[in-house]
């Protein structure tokens, strides 16, 4: 189980790299992204498929995810957030909303990414936003607009 979690974590790290890149540059095509993922995950099909699903899903639903994050990230415009934080939030939000990953697992994994790649305040900020998103997704009346 530990190996599975750490390898899935590695897949998430690779997806974060690609989301970061897509945020700053033109989006790679899916074939180029899959090739990058496959090379970083040493061709492991299950992990490559997992990473590709996270990347493709996050990119396909980015506008919807951004709208939800904007609504729930009080006093923070998405475009003003650090690029890393914004993309950790997008990935975590995709997992909570669409992937079937349990909410607490998605939040925990996002916090791990934030601690590793974000700034000093990133984990606390990301935890707050994703926790609100998870609560809202679970029960829309639980979070005020």
From Swiss-Prot:
<dbReference type="InterPro" id="IPR011605">
    <property type="entry name" value="NusB_fam"/>
</dbReference>
<dbReference type="GO" id="GO:0031564">
    <property type="term" value="P:transcription antitermination"/>
</dbReference>
<dbReference type="InterPro" id="IPR035926">
    <property type="entry name" value="NusB-like_sf"/>
</dbReference>
<protein>
    <recommendedName>
        <fullName>Transcription antitermination protein NusB</fullName>
    </recommendedName>
</protein>
<dbReference type="GO" id="GO:0006353">
    <property type="term" value="P:DNA-templated transcription termination"/>
</dbReference>
<comment type="function">
    <text>Involved in transcription antitermination. Required for transcription of ribosomal RNA (rRNA) genes. Binds specifically to the boxA antiterminator sequence of the ribosomal RNA (rrn) operons.</text>
</comment>
<dbReference type="GO" id="GO:0003723">
    <property type="term" value="F:RNA binding"/>
</dbReference>
<keyword id="KW-0889">Transcription antitermination</keyword>
<keyword id="KW-0805">Transcription regulation</keyword>
<dbReference type="Pfam" id="PF01029">
    <property type="entry name" value="NusB"/>
</dbReference>
<dbReference type="GO" id="GO:0005829">
    <property type="term" value="C:cytosol"/>
</dbReference>
<comment type="similarity">
    <text>Belongs to the NusB family.</text>
</comment>
<keyword id="KW-0694">RNA-binding</keyword>
<keyword id="KW-0804">Transcription</keyword>
<dbReference type="InterPro" id="IPR006027">
    <property type="entry name" value="NusB_RsmB_TIM44"/>
</dbReference>
